[in-house]
Amino acid sequence: MNQWRVIHNKSYEGAMNMAIDEAIFTAYKKGHNKPTLRFYTWEPACLSIGYFQKLEDEIDLDKCRCMNIDYTRRITGGRAVLHDNELTYSIIIGEDNPLIDKSINLSYRYISEGLVKGLNLSGIETDNLNRGERISRENLSAACFNAHASYEVTINNKKVIGSAQSRKDGVLLQHGSIILDFDVEKLFKLIKTKTPELKERAMKFTAKKASGIENEIGRKIDIDILQKNIVKGLAEQFNVEFVEGDLTDYEKQLVKELYEKYKNEEYNKKR
């Protein structure tokens, strides 16, 4: 049975979390590590924006500072995500791995199936995975959780896990937010819209489309137990053995270099 590395949950600021993900991604491209599953949380809470978003056009930076909300740009695409009461995962694996479909949608589905198995082991029932929905552009905001992409995990038809994927030089990085407690009002205090009326409409729309696991099942989740069960679910899905590990010395050096990039205002505002 193939062995993958798992790095268990630690809490970091946004720039550090993104630096670590990219360091693992880069090291894998150069043959320095195994396929890796990583869990992490965010301290302080952080608003991450997609690689192609325009930070100053879409995010209220003054409000972020006032509310002590960090912000950073992801290596992946998609829209803004408020990382607060959640467990985040990332998976780094070669595109040539037979488990990874060349289709982005089908690889999303395969990973989501493993996440669902982990939730089920935690006594959490989810909806059936589906191809997502066609969304009117009138309803779109800078926020990620106001639309269902293909094969995203939902409970009561509300997205509870939002993921984004990047592929480069034959390597796949997918990371995603497993939302425990979703605060839509807090999120939209940070999101810019053209008018207050549009913000109110977008907030109501998002509240119908997204939630947190705890909000939907009505009980608290032990994050350590959830993490262990997701490892089990993904191990079953991929038919691999996860071996606990940490960053290599090479990865740690990369993290130091990449951290400076993700902390740099010019990088975060470059679009």
Swiss-Prot record:
One of its GO terms (molecular function) is lipoyl(octanoyl) transferase activity. Pathway: Protein modification; protein lipoylation via endogenous pathway; protein N(6)-(lipoyl)lysine from octanoyl-[acyl-carrier-protein]. It comes from the Bacteria. The active site is at C144 (acyl-thioester intermediate). GO terms for biological process: lipoate biosynthetic process; protein modification process. Pfam families: LplA-B_cat. The record marks K159 as: Lowers pKa of active site Cys. It is an enzyme of class 2 (transferase). The keyword Transferase applies. It catalyses: octanoyl-[ACP] + L-lysyl-[protein] = N(6)-octanoyl-L-lysyl-[protein] + holo-[ACP] + H(+). InterPro entries: aa-tRNA-synth_II/BPL/LPL (IPR045864), BPL_LPL_catalytic (IPR004143), LipM (IPR024898), Octanoyltrans_LipM/LipL (IPR050664). Its EC number is 2.3.1.181. Keywords: Acyltransferase, Transferase. Residues 31-242 form the BPL/LPL catalytic domain. Catalyzes the transfer of endogenously produced octanoic acid from octanoyl-acyl-carrier-protein onto the lipoyl domain of GcvH, an intermediate carrier during protein lipoylation. In the reaction, the free carboxyl group of octanoic acid is attached via an amide linkage to the epsilon-amino group of a specific lysine residue of lipoyl domains of lipoate-dependent enzymes. The reaction proceeds via an octanoyl-thioester enzyme intermediate. PANTHER family: OCTANOYL-[GCVH]:PROTEIN N-OCTANOYLTRANSFERASE, OCTANOYLTRANSFERASE LIPM-RELATED. Belongs to the octanoyltransferase LipM family. Monomer. This is Octanoyltransferase LipM. It comes from Clostridioides difficile (strain 630) (Peptoclostridium difficile). The lineage of its organism: Bacteria, Bacillati, Bacillota, Clostridia, Peptostreptococcales.
